[in-house]
C-alpha cells in the first residue's frame, strides 16, 4: 500500500532575484513533491512571504489568492522608470521637487481606501491574448486595464530624501509598483520602487516563513514536515462544520453528502457565503462544501483524502 503523501501549505520566504515559479520548482524537486503551486506571484526582485500549496492543497489554492497582503517597500523619489522599479530604464528625473515629511504624510493618507488602479505596462496580465510585459518589450502601446483595489492602510515608516520607506496592507490585485508611482506623481516628483518585501499574506507572516536553505536542511531528515500547515488550518478564514457522525463521514469520502445533514446545516449560512470547511472530529479537512452555489452547474462538494 502506497504511503499517504503529505498535503498542506508551506509558507516560504522568497529570496531576491528568483521567480516565484523557480522557487516552487526547486522546493518541489527538493522535497520530492508530486504537486506544488504558489498562491500569488512576487516579482523576481521582491522578497518575502510566498504561499505554496502542496499535493491535495493545490485543489483549494484559489481560496488563498484573494487574501489581503502586507508589504514594506522603499521608494526612490525623483526618478521614474519604465517598469516602475529599480530593474527598469530611467524615463524621467526631477530633483527640483523635494517633498516635506508633512506633504508626504498627506499624500500617503489620500491613497488609503478603495480606488481604481491602472495595471503597470510591465505586468503578466493579458491584453489581446498577450501578456502586457511582452507587448511593452516590443514597444506596442495598448490601453492598460484598470482594477478596483482597496488600500486598508498606508503608513510612512521613515523618510530621508530621496528615499522613503512605506508599509501597506492591501487587497488582492494591488500593484505596489503602481502605488509608489501614483504617490510620486501626486507629490510632483515621480518615484519608483527600490526594495519590496511581502510581510504577510492573510494570517501567514514572515515569522512562519522558511527560507530555501531551511527547506534544504529539512529535506534530509523529514523535519520540513513540521513546517507544513495542515489543510484545515490553511483555510482558517473559512467557516467550518465538524462531522462526528461516522456514517455521514463514510458517505462523504465517496463524494456523497447526506441529504438530511445538508438540509439541517445549510440554513446556518447566508446565501452570500462561499465554501465551508467540513472537518473531522480531530480537525482534519474532509471536504469543501458550497451550501449555496452560484449556479446549478457549480460543483457543491470537493472531497479530500483523509
Swiss-Prot record:
Positions annotated as active site in the UniProt record: 43
CDD domains reported in the protein's UniProt record: PseudoU_synth_EcTruB (cd02573)
Keyword presence, Isomerase: yes
Catalysed reactions, as listed in the record: uridine(55) in tRNA = pseudouridine(55) in tRNA
Any one GO molecular-function label of the UniProt entry: tRNA pseudouridine(55) synthase activity
BP-aspect Gene Ontology terms: mRNA pseudouridine synthesis; tRNA pseudouridine synthesis
Keywords attached to this entry: Isomerase, tRNA processing
EC number: 5.4.99.25
Similarity section: Belongs to the pseudouridine synthase TruB family. Type 1 subfamily.
HAMAP family, A to Z: TruB_bact
Function: Responsible for synthesis of pseudouridine from uracil-55 in the psi GC loop of transfer RNAs.
Protein name: tRNA pseudouridine synthase B
Species of the source: Syntrophobacter fumaroxidans (strain DSM 10017 / MPOB)
Taxonomy of the source species: Bacteria, Pseudomonadati, Thermodesulfobacteriota, Syntrophobacteria, Syntrophobacterales
